[in-house]
């Protein structure tokens, strides 16, 4: 996001050179906020034991987040939510959850919850137990997360609280 913010500030400064200082000041403020959010999120993720740092969701929308903060993503679907979900995908992921004793899986605000609920039932059928750890915001924001920074911090809180 820092790269995109700089690109936007540069383009606005090009279009409205008389406001360049204003755009640069806002950019620096935003970059500082992003840096603070990054540190906050890393601290929250560090509260989770390393062996529990699995982020399991309906689709693979959190790959970049997970890579940056040291989580492993496992998803029922890939990035697209349009593809069909097969029972084999649910079975394989349920086996993985039981094998790794994963405590929580997550629903997403913009994705139907049925596949995650089916995954939870498949884990129970195998004698395991996994909780739905909360709702994550991937393609949309929630009531209390009207900015990108508030959204990623809320996601970090939800993940950390469920997995630690």
Which sequence ranges carry the predicted segments?
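Extracytoplasmic metal-acquisition and chelation regions
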Residues: 1-164
């Amino acid at each position: 996001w820092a790269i995109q913010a700089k690109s936007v500030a540069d383009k606005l400064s090009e279009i409205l050179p008389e406001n360049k200082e204003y755009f640069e000041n806002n950019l620096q403020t935003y970059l500082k906020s992003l840096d603070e959010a990054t540190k906050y999120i890393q601290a929250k993720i560090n509260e989770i034991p390393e062996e529990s740092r699995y982020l399991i969701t309906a689709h693979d929308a959190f790959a970049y987040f997970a890579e940056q903060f040291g989580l492993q993503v496992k998803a029922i679907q890939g990035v697209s939510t349009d593809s069909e979900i097969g029972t084999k995908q649910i079975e394989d992921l349920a086996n993985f959850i039981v094998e790794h004793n994963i405590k929580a899986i997550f629903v997403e605000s913009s994705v139907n919850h049925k596949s995650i609920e089916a995954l939870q039932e498949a884990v129970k059928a195998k004698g395991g137990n996994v909780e739905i750890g909360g709702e994550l915001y991937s393609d949309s924001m929630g009531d209390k997360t009207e900015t990108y920074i508030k959204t990623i911090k809320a996601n970090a809180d939800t993940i950390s609280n469920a997995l630690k």
